[in-house]
């Protein structure tokens, strides 16, 4: 082939000769510049994890490009090579491969980091120190890896107030609840006295041995106590809505005895009045009135962002609302007003609950007049056609029923919630005492007065305690089992009890637990905001209301849940998350 083609050289058959000529050329160039020659192979041996390049001298551009088809195993440094000693100093800066640019400061006698290490494919691609336009002193990082920012702790140090009544709480934690079992007689007695005297207990941030903490166990007993009227141990007094089946077979001697019913109602009226007087004096923060049809929540001034006494009633019917209007009770329906989306601003007196009945009646009459005129206009086309006598027009009664159809649709729904403010709450008190429809006339609850629930003692009240039970179970995790501890609380659980229990568990369970909350559905709407707009915080003088100062601080907040309620509560690292 060499003889047939002039200029053809079979030098490729002798690579050793080519390498010898390359080394000779390198030594000659180094001798001219006065630098000590070195072999690229020596650099490869001394640099840990550096893959050998293709043979040949450096020409012109200086550095051979990395083979893009090379195996990653030849490129990525192994953990053993990462711990190799740092590359020694090199004198030939002009002949130094750009792969050693990260160690150039050491050649200048300065402190430098360790040789570049590749931990992933992205580091090899984006962090390649051989990039032609890369600064030798700056490491290029992957654009897909943003700089790590300071992590903001999730959750909040507290949770919003939930004014709904709960029927069951289920706490779970990785730490045992054995400290809540088998209270000693002295601890139980001390807890009852602490509740009667409204003694506030401040526990440490974390308790190492909860079972040995007497203060914790006494405070736990204190948080379970509530007051109720009437007290009939063999009859379920909460909840009262939709529980007729559970009361089947119970002995109810008052159902057929009118004299006994009168005695029960007179005692109930005294207890109800006593509770309202305590509320007005800010010695009771709130209380509930539970009937077989609806539930009423009375709150003292300063709670839920209101500077006056408020009462929330749900669910209601059109007949009940009409009866309240006839008694002169001024009320509002927050959810109905929100749904209509009225653009006109209400006067300030209306926002405070002092609505002028004359103006309200005048507005209603004007609306009725306009509706009647609309009805007359809607039938004018019949007269034009001359058939007005042949077609039967709807009478005034049917027109009125059609107008009231929208009001009837709200009955027994959350949107039927009614809000009463200020002095109208006292009128509501008298209305409920004298209203016969709040007591069932027939059925299993016939003649039974409504249930009064309060966090503090009142006239005719009986002290009750929530039922607590701890259970230890093993849950399967991967290939083994893990201990899971739970604490179940049942009974009429009011807002102060929920907050008190979470404060205790925060210390006893070292800031790590979760809770499932089971809401009495008719009361979930009690979280409806009182004000349509945000209001300033109100300083509430409720130091003597019988609750812990931290609990009072939570209950004074403006409602944030709307017509919803808390279903799940979780604490992690002493911070709450909920849904």
UniProtKB/Swiss-Prot annotation:
Membrane-crossing residue ranges in chain numbering: none
Biased composition annotated in UniProt, kind: Basic and acidic residues: 339-348
Swiss-Prot/TrEMBL keywords: Cell cycle, Cell division, Developmental protein, Nucleus
InterPro entries: Donson
Family: Belongs to the DONSON family.
Assembly and oligomerization: Component of the replisome complex.
DNA damage in keyword set: no
Name of the protein: Protein downstream neighbor of son homolog
Region (Disordered) residue spans: 1-68, 331-379
Biased composition, class Acidic residues, residue ranges: 365-378
One Gene Ontology term, aspect cellular component: replication fork
Cited function: Replisome component that maintains genome stability by protecting stalled or damaged replication forks. After the induction of replication stress, required for the stabilization of stalled replication forks, the efficient activation of the intra-S-phase and G/2M cell-cycle checkpoints and the maintenance of genome stability.
Domain of life according to the entry: Eukaryota
GO term, biological process aspect, one: DNA damage checkpoint signaling
Organism (species): Xenopus laevis (African clawed frog)
Localization: Nucleus
């Amino acid at each position: 082939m060499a003889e047939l083609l002039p200029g053809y050289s079979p030098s490729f058959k002798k690579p050793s000769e080519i390498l010898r000529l390359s080394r000779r050329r390198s030594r000659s160039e180094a001798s001219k510049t006065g630098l000590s020659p070195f072999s690229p192979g020596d650099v490869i041996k001394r640099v840990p994890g550096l893959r050998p390049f293709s043979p040949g001298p450096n020409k012109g551009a200086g550095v051979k490009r990395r083979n893009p088809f090379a195996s990653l195993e030849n490129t990525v440094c192994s953990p053993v090579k990462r711990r190799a000693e740092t590359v020694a100093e090199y004198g030939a800066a002009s002949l130094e491969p750009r792969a050693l640019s990260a160690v150039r400061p050491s050649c200048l006698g300065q402190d430098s980091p360790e040789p570049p290490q590749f931990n992933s494919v992205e580091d090899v691609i984006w962090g390649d120190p051989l990039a032609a336009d890369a600064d030798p002193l700056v490491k290029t990082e992957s654009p897909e890896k943003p700089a790590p920012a300071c992590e903001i702790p999730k959750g909040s140090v507290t949770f919003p107030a939930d004014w709904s009544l709960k029927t069951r709480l289920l706490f779970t934690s990785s730490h045992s609840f054995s400290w809540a079992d088998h209270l000693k007689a002295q601890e139980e007695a001390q807890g009852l006295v602490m509740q009667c005297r409204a003694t506030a207990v401040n526990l440490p941030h974390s308790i190492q041995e909860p079972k040995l903490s007497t203060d914790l166990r006494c405070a736990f007993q204190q948080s379970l106590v509530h007051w109720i009227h009437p007290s009939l141990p063999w009859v379920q007094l909460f909840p009262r809505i939709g529980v007729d089946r559970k009361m089947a077979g119970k002995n109810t001697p008052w159902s057929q005895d009118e004299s006994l019913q009168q005695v029960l109602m007179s005692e109930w009226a005294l207890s109800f009045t006593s509770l309202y007087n305590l509320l007005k004096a800010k010695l009771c923060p709130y209380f509930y009135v539970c009937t077989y049809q609806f539930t009423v929540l009375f709150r003292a001034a300063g709670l839920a962002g209101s500077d006056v006494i408020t009462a929330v009633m749900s669910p209601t019917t059109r007949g009940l609302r009409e009866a309240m209007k006839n008694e002169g009770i001024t009320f509002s329906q927050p959810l109905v007003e929100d749904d209509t989306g009225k653009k006109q601003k209400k006067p300030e007196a209306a926002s405070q609950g002092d609505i002028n009945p004359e103006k309200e009646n005048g507005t209603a009459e004007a609306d009725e007049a306009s509706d009647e005129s609309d009805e007359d206009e809607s039938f004018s086309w019949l007269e034009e056609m001359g058939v007005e006598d042949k077609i039967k027009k709807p009478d005034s009664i049917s027109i009125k029923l059609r107008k009231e159809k929208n009001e009837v649709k709200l009955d027994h729904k959350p949107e039927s919630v009614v809000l009463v403010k200020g002095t109208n709450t006292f009128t509501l008190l008298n209305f409920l005492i004298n209203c016969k429809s709040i007591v069932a006339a027939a059925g299993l609850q016939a003649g039974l007065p409504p249930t009064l629930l309060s966090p503090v003692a009142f006239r005719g009240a009986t002290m009750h305690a929530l039922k607590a039970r701890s259970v230890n179970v093993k849950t399967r995790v991967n290939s083994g089992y893990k201990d899971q501890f739970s604490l179940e609380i049942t009974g009429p659980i009011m807002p102060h009890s929920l907050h008190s229990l979470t404060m205790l568990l925060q210390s006893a369970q070292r800031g790590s637990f979760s809770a499932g909350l089971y809401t009495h559905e008719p009361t979930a709407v009690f979280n409806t905001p009182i004000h349509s707009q945000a209001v300033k915080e109100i300083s509430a003088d409720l130091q003597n209301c019988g609750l812990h100062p931290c609990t009072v601080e939570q209950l004074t907040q403006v409602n944030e849940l709307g017509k919803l309620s808390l279903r799940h509560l979780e604490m992690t690292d002493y911070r709450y998350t909920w849904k």
